[in-house]
From Swiss-Prot:
Pathway: Amino-acid biosynthesis; D-alanine biosynthesis; D-alanine from L-alanine: step 1/1. Keywords: Isomerase, Pyridoxal phosphate. The active site is at K34 (proton acceptor), Y254 (proton acceptor). Pfam families: Ala_racemase_C, Ala_racemase_N. This is Alanine racemase.
Length: 360
């Protein structure tokens, strides 16, 4: 019997990439495959996104793994390089890099490289995490344009902090700041990630950088991805390993936090926080068994959860349990837990098997 398994639908991944192209028809697509492709398996996802124009990762190790797997299209290091010692590897593997700090700029100026690198100057328009502040941006850009180790023209990127909020004045101010700096400068521009693609079409520019939306999960709190025409690619499943008679007033699980208000049947599911199911999921969080939703009962354990099947349930050991997927969106589970959907799909552990299908 299978236990925790994440089934990844390649057809859904391809559909989502094409949906991005429909929403941003004049932009190239940087498929973001960092963090193991948001839990979907980086190598498999990258090959499935073979029609993307480029890939985006957060770590040099991710980029090198893609190259080792035969990915030849451009790859952008979204956080840049972390040490001057990394620069020869970037040249060897033809990687593009963000440049956001004085230390990175100095390393580029001082390096002896066999050929120049394509770079993306990261402008801090309001995220205040990485990036060159606007008051320092012109001087920084001038040094990059004069650097012998940089392919010209210099590309420019930034990142929205609140693009998932339709009325956020912050996004408009960030876009105004970006426009003021990029006006008249050559090179590609990129500022829109998933939220910007969905809600701010004026931000699409030369390249868009879809992340979570590529996997059929919404970046918005109040709408799931299906509302925008995307298909969830992951179905997280396990199976019932026990069905037990449970009596009124009996508690279940660690701490006895849930007590049955009636005689019922409890199902024990072979999944827990050791597989990546959220430990913070409260009683009442739904799972799907035999086409109906049933509520979580008691605390999530490392290896198991218990669910209230109901007094007349006919479910049996071996029946499949859907924890999230197209028929039970992960956004709903996130709402129950107080965690974000980003967390849920990226926290699956090595014990959860990844399987790939090309079906509906």
């Amino acid at each position: 019997m299978k236990t925790a398994t994440a089934v990844i639908n390649r057809r859904a991944l391809r559909h989502n990439l094409q949906r991005i192209r429909q929403l941003a028809p004049d932009s190239q697509v940087v498929a973001i495959v960092k963090a193991n492709a948001y839990g979907h398996g980086m190598i498999e996802a990258a090959h499935t996104f073979c029609d993307a124009d480029c890939y985006g990762v957060a770590r040099l190790s991710e980029a090198l793994a893609l190259r080792a797997a035969g990915i030849t299209k451009p790859i952008v290091l979204l956080e840049g390089f972390f040490s001057a010692d990394d620069l020869p590897l970037l040249v060897e593997h033809q990687l593009e890099t963000a440049v956001h700090s004085p230390e990175q700029l100095a390393a580029l100026e001082q390096a002896t490289l066999s050929q120049p690198l394509r770079v993306w100057m990261k402008l801090d328009t309001g995220m205040h995490r990485l990036g060159v502040l606007p008051e320092h941006a012109d001087a920084f850009w001038q040094r990059l344009t004069a650097c012998r180790n940089v392919v010209q023209p210099v590309n420019i990127m930034s990142h929205f902090s609140r693009a998932d909020e339709p009325e956020a004045g912050t996004t408009e101010r960030q876009l105004t700041c970006f426009d003021a700096f990029t006006q008249g400068k050559p090179g590609a521009q990129s500022i829109a990630a998933s939220g910007g693609i969905l809600l701010w079409p004026q931000s699409h520019r030369d390249r868009v950088r879809p992340g979570i939306i590529l996997y059929g999960v919404s970046p918005l709190d109040n709408e799931d991805a299906a509302h925008f025409g995307f298909q969830p690619a992951m179905t997280f499943t396990s199976h019932l390993i026990a069905v037990r008679e449970h009596h009124t007033g009996e508690a279940v699980g660690y701490g006895g936090t849930w007590t049955s208000p009636r005689n019922t049947r409890l199902g024990v599911v072979a999944v827990g926080y050791g597989d990546g199911y959220p430990r913070c999921a409260p009683a009442g969080t739904p799972v799907l068994i035999n086409g109906r939703e049933v509520p979580l009962s008691g605390r999530v354990s490392m290896d198991m959860i218990t669910v209230d099947l109901g007094p007349d349930a006919q479910d049996k050991v071996g029946d499949e349990v859907i924890l999230w997927g197209p028929t039970l969106p992960v956004e709903r589970i996130a709402a129950h837990t107080g965690a974000s959907a980003y967390e849920l799909i990226t926290r699956l552990t090595q014990r959860t098997a990844l399987e790939y299908v090309d079906g509906e």
